[in-house]
Amino acid sequence: MPKRLDINTILVIGSGPIVIGQAAEFDYSGTQACQSLREEGYKVILVNSNPATIMTDTATADKVYIEPLTLEFVSRIIRKERPDAILPTLGGQTGLNMAVELAKSGILEECGVEILGTKLSAIEQAEDRDLFRTLMQELNEPIPSSTIIHTLEEAHEFVKEIGYPVIVRPAFTMGGTGGGICSNEEELIEIVSGGLKHSPVTQCLLEKSIAGCKEIEYEVMRDSNDNAIVVCNMENIDPVGVHTGDSIVVAPSQTLSDREYQMLRNTSLRIIRALGIEGGCNVQLALDPHSFQYYVIEVNPRVSRSSALASKATGYPIAKLAAKIAVGLTLDEIINPVTQKTYACFEPALDYVVSKIPRWPFDKFESANRTLGTQMKATGEVMSIGRNLEQSLLKAVRSLELGVYHLELEHLKELDKETMKKRIIKADDERLFIVAEAIRQGVTKEEINEWCEMDFFFLQKVENIVNMEREVKANVGNMEVLQTAKEMGFSDHYVAAAWNKTEREIYDMRKESNITPVYKMVDTCAAEFESATPYYYSTYGDENESVRTDRKSVVVLGSGPIRIGQGVEFDYATVHSVWAIKEAGYEAIIVNNNPETVSTDFSISDKLYFEPLTIEDVMHIIDLEKPEGVIVQFGGQTAINLAAKLEEHGVKILGTSLEDLDRAEDRDKFEAALTQLGIPQPVGKTATTVEQAVAIAEEIGYPVLVRPSYVLGGRAMEIVYRQEELLHYMKNAVKVHAEHPVLIDRYMVGKEIEVDAISDGENVFIPGIMEHIERAGVHSGDSIGVYPPQSLSEKLKEQIIEHTIALGKGLNIVGLLNIQFVVFKDQVYVIEVNPRASRTVPFLSKITGVPMANVATKVILGQDLVEQGYGTGYHPEEKEVYVKAPVFSFAKLRSVDTTLGPEMKSTGEVMGKDLTLEKALYKGLVASGINIPTHGSVIITVADKDKEEAMEIAKRFHEIGYNLLATAGTAQSLAEQNIPVQVVNKIDSEDYNLLDIIRQGKAQFVINTLTKGKQPARDGFRIRRESVENGVACLTSLDTTRAILRVLESMTFSAHSMKEITQTKRHEVVHA
């Protein structure tokens, strides 16, 4: 059936900010879909709130709206643009929920808009647990015995009937939000209460736990002619019970017999047909390892995290084809873009093994509960490809960016058998490493299988790796053993340690003995047809399929998995850099390992290598390609950290030299440079011992800011107010020694300013200056940023511009630089300089229209700023106000403190833009998920040091009609200022207390600042967590609170009696 001609304009709904459960995979799928629809001649309008993505570039769609994804704003866009149809299935759960909300509000009917891809009835049948259960029963498809509940009482009734354990799955949520496995009444009460709150329809499915079954996923496609295919099937190494986003996954499935494979394939196709989905769909199934009994777990009637993985694993571009199917094209009409010969109705075939390992944020959140269950906790993932499972797994392990090069962790060697058993049964982020350790210590595969029901096939593969370790250790210098180890995926780093040599020595030994990898192509058809895609993975074998061309080439290093501190912003910069390299006439080669991102779409670069970002893996590519050089500026800290080792190997680092990178990162060299340039900075020194640290802090004076050198995302940074806190930090947060010094700075309570600039060594161009709402001390990634600055005097702005130009030239920067300043007592100080792309590059590029990564790349390749039409100086400011607001995933991470500080905690960001600061803030806050009601109650419990400041805030809340609630201490201070307040009991009170108010939804805001000391700190933590669990906005910075007040005040009409007005006027006369 040819494409539809009765529709012209299509509104695509994006997925909004990156949160746990919904990450960069939707930037990839959304970008693909918009391009795919435009190829077919449709006018595409995009709405998304996330400025950090390629998807929200103006070139992606005919019109791009960066606006909150709420009913209010999307309805406005529909009324203004009058699209013929909307496509919500590429915007993740956000897109689906938005479609349902729009349909129910009546706007779609009012404006004559139809839903493409997945019909509303199919969305509801798949997402509403009750309707889905009914459909499965009609199809005679087995599902675990279950019930739908809307109250806690109903949950208790069901458990009486079938007993524990039970799984709770809230309706219309993603990433398992609010769900979990309950083994007793206490867990049931906690998880069901939370699940009902998180479900927008207050509905949960309670089902008998089938934990321990194999978890299998099928990624299926169907068109309007009822052609349906399986694109890829995947198997979770972790059995049912761990969310698939937190599971280690392999593709294709490894342990299914043909009968099992066909049985589950038929079920998946039967389900997509019954739902009538036109496009992509993900079916999750559980299979009893001891029989042919299977269960349908759930269906995602949309493009998902798994479809991004399936696309990259097979090369089959699911989102691109799903968009074409949505407008009426059929699988037998669409050419497969990979082979450019076969049609899209051919099911992909794989002649390799793909492994995906999640990347968790536990290195950031030491206190988080690491146990894995049905609620997702990973922020991102890595993927690797190999010719055997061992090779594929070990390549994935070293892609994780945890400084780990093998399936072993030093700290696990101390574990006794009982501890290992507990952790393997319970499942946490280190389970696979613990399984390997258990096998090293002689625990049998049978015992491990009994503990966690992991399939013997996977346990055998881990045992093969452990046996190979023994071979390597027993045969030092044996090249045959080395060849076998490399075929199994062992790294030079591991072999070097086992043979007591350096990594470089092993590398040289291999080259001499000709033990080097070859590169194979990902072609969707197991080499049955000739393929046109330059998409490669390394393995050890005979024939190399990646042929070097005669063109000059440049290698760009990507940023690896999405994690806190290094998000999709760096992928954005990487993609723009690749485009600029191509425009400049070079061959662009990209190395990256993140299956979710646009940069690993094979159509972006001239060559894509899906490989770990380690020195060994990158050097193999450089040895083959012999590029002009490597660009490390756009891959975040991942790429910067490889610069020195690459240079040791004789590789040319393009852009800012290694020496100058080091001058910006090394504390003493940086201080010397600033002194030479005459630029002030907060007093600070470097400590290499605990005693030194104590002496420096005494000399500078508390409070001080302490942090390790060379970090991204403020890892292990803290503001310390007295010596006990400093000693606690030195003992727990860092291992200080000569090679890893700790930086100690005077902490200045001032306004923080952030600047991004581009330098060619001679000229320095500044696209934008941003002002942070939160004062210095809150990480820049967690602050609300405002452009253009709203409260900077011209004099201060000039100082900032002068310092930026001096730093760009003085540090010999070639490419991008990001500078953070603090304004303290009308003086500008430099806090830090990052000689690389920062997380604000996409935001400022979109606002100013200066394609920063593109311009910087051309500078790096030798085209100076003047040639490109830019010179030295500050880009004219825009008239509108733009706000960048952070988005957090605290609801997914139990026991993480939500207090903001110098350590970054946000996972994503949104943008709000309008004519005034208040309106832009309103949009930014609403887009980030903060509800802003014009009236209600606010709970105020603040630290003593903040009481004075909190008085003015409380007064303003009272002025606009808010009811104030406070515990005794704060209430007394308020009463002394004649501010009406209602006293509430502290949380340790047996009577109705502060936590009860939060749980019952009787407060709209909670203002709580961090109090140091044991009990108050614990109380504050419980108040903050309770707020998150109950969806109440908890404000831990008084600056953020002031910003929200500005918005509330701008929305509220004043209500003063005439007497108050005349008194105010009389008061003014007296003062005059």
Curated annotation (Swiss-Prot):
Annotated positions binding Mg(2+) 4: 832, 834
* Pfam families found in the cross-reference section: CPSase_L_D2, CPSase_L_D3, MGS
Q: Where is this region: Carboxyphosphate synthetic domain?
A: 1-401
Which residue ranges does the record assign to the MGS-like domain? 930-1072
Q: Do you know which PROSITE patterns this protein is assigned to?
A: ATP_GRASP, CPSASE_1, CPSASE_2, MGS
Similarity annotation: Belongs to the CarB family.
Name under which the protein is recorded: Carbamoyl phosphate synthase large chain
Q: Which organism is it from?
A: Bacillus cereus (strain G9842)
Gene encoding this chain? carB
